[in-house]
Amino acid sequence: MPYSEIEAKFLGPGKELTREPCYKKLKSAVDDGVFPHRGGPDSHRIQEKTKNNRLPVATINFRRRVCPGEDKTSTDVLKPLHKEMPGDKVGGTESIGSQALQDGKPLAPARDDEIYSTSKAFIGPIYKPPEKKKCRERKNETATFNNTDSKRRQEEKQKFNSKKLEIDTELSQFYKEIEELENENEASQGSCKEPEPSQEQTLSHDQACNTLKPEGESKDLSTVLQSHCGYQPYLEDESDYPCDEQLIPAFCDTSFPSFRPEWQSVHPFVIPHDPLPSFNYFNIQRFGAPLHPPPSVFHARDDARLQSGCYIDSYQDGWSCLTLDQNDEYANYDVPGNVHPFGNGYGVQDDSVKNGFCEIRECWQDPSMDMHNEADRFVNQCFQEDRLNKLQKLLILLRGLPGSGKTTLSRILLGQSRDGIVFSTDDYFHHQDGYRYNVNQLGDAHDWNQNRAKQAIDQGRSPVIIDNTNTQAWEMKPYVEMAIGKGYRVEFHEPETWWKFDPEELEKRNKHGVSRKKIAQMLDRYEFQMSISIVMNSVEPTQKSTQTPLPLQGDQRWGGSLGSHSQVSITDDY
């Protein structure tokens, strides 16, 4: 310890000096052989033996450093004592102290087994603990790690920026290539321009190729091609009605000037040279107007309705050119995959012209876009057809044997529209006192029902539902003619019941007692395939066989002509 106090006591002859800590002297104020403490904490008291058991006391100040000019009187006093007791340990101690004083150097601290010392100063480590060094090392390591991490992040950020720049460059190059391809396509499309013929010009079927204008120009339809027709169809006069970029052809004779509607055109329709398609039951059928209408045909009235994209406002009773021999090929026909159904029941193809129909198509130069354009054309055509169907008036012809469920079906269809109406030839035989059938009145009953339907069509009622058996096509021809003349759309509907062709079940379900035998005869004459073309090409039989009326009232009404028995349809229910 750097600072200590030593107190010496004489214990008697032959005893060694003992050292006590300074704190012991505080306990007793008077102690034998102990002098009052003089000096600071650095002073030591030394007691030596003498002849009278008294020791001279020399006060020695132990300091770490002793000034050279310090007073050395104490050293001179101690020298004789050293000579008298050379072997004494106290003398050794005195000699050591004297030597230390002479040299001016601090006295070395006594050993632990001889001197007990205490310190009033704080006992603790002189130097900083090693933990601080470790903390500094950790801080240095953390700083080094942070610097390394920041450098690594900067490198990653630079790599990411370089990759992003490469991707942006590739994208810009890709967009440039796409733009170049689009410009090339536009340039190739610009080579085909749509001709604009005059209003008085007529085109034959071999000149029927319309071209598509480039993008940016107007897409208005500039020409409608005319053709010579193999037979006299109805003429569809057109008016200015927008059809959402749908190409609508018109069929007319070359003796009339071409019409130029104002709606826009995008997709082509090509008229087929193959036979017309056949349709079944619920398929929608449309037909054109006669070729030579009265002069009023060219003035579209307000009640004219849009038929297959064109306004139809004409009607003519004469169908002299239509014979079964010429057009019976239309009876059975399946629509091929590349034929698009047209609005009036005809299909369209990309081949040459036949049967007096002209070909209308776009001039498309890029074969890589054919598939995409074909899909767009089909979707656009379906959407346009649905839109036209909603705008047009509707004539529904129900077909089915007695008891098959026609009346129930008519009620369902009638409930879907507020302005609809149902007509049945069988209503003629309903009286206030009940139902009375008279075969001699069968012709009058048909005329009466047709007149009612015509009045409803003239008034614009829709849908007009004809609830007759309509087993054969010629029975429906008067209704189809008057409907097409007023721009109505024509549909054929049959009840979808499992017993509709089962004579035994039909006998049980019909309300007027029609026998199973009569129902079987009607089923033998039933024409399953039905379409507009079949109806318009049908002819009423010239030879009519008569039958003797049966006694039963339910069978008596079937005793008329072969042709009329199917038209006198009973309002059946199930």
UniProtKB/Swiss-Prot annotation:
Q: Which UniProt keywords apply?
A: Coiled coil
The record ties this protein, via SUPFAM superfamilies, to: P-loop containing nucleoside triphosphate hydrolases (SSF52540)
Question: Could you tell me which residues belong to the region Disordered?
Answer: 82-110, 127-161, 182-204, 542-574
Protein name listed in UniProt: NEDD4-binding protein 2-like 2
Keyword field contains Coiled coil: yes
Q: Which ranges are annotated Polar residues under compositional bias?
A: 563-574
What residue spans carry the Basic and acidic residues bias annotation?
A: 129-141, 149-161
GO MF terms held by the record: enzyme binding; transcription corepressor activity
- Domain of life of the native organism: Eukaryota
Q: Name one GO cellular component term.
A: transcription repressor complex
Q: What pairs make up the disulfide bonds? A: none
Coiled-coil intervals = 162-196
Q: Which is a GO BP term held by this UniProt record?
A: negative regulation of hematopoietic stem cell differentiation
Coiled coil as a keyword of this entry, yes or no, is yes
